[in-house]
Amino acid sequence: TDTVSISFAPNNDIAWNNNHGETIDPAIAAALVAGFHTGVIDADAPDTTPWNYSVADADLDFLANGESITFSYTITATDSEGATDTHTLNFTIDGTNDAPTVSATAATGFTEDIDASLQQLTDNGTVSFDDIDTTDTVSISFAPNNDIAWNNNHGETIDPAIAAALVAGFHTG
């Protein structure tokens, strides 16, 4: 009975299909390649040994929907007489569309002057956004919630023209 040694090696052929000509960060490429493992290294023939591949989801978050990464390993079996055989194991990882994130600074509020006829009320803040899919473009838009309330202690409702003017006062840019 021959003892067979199993070894594997990455083929250094990692490719990112992203239509933007970008290359994979070397640290991420190293994490992707390090994800492959085999079980038994030396065994009496005939036998089988399991393999597995595992990579942290965070290492793939940059990969957008429609993009893929391909790479391969060569598995070599060497018997006790020195004869060898090889097999190439190919991997393809397909990306998904990770949702963008958005946040905004809260409005600080302001108080109308007693004589507000010439007063310009203003407030400002920032909208922060990100998308871990590195090739995605993020568009920011806003829509009013139609929840303008008038606290006047008389039960009156706000005039629709005034509500529209309040909504029109918000803009980005």
What spans do the regions from the language model cover?
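Extracellular ectodomain surface segments
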Residues: 1-32, 101-171
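Acidic, turn/loop-rich segments in luminal/extracellular domains of secretory-pathway
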Residues: 20-93, 114-117, 151-173
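Residue-level signal for well-ordered, solvent-exposed loop/turn and beta-edge residues enriched
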Residues: 83, 99-101
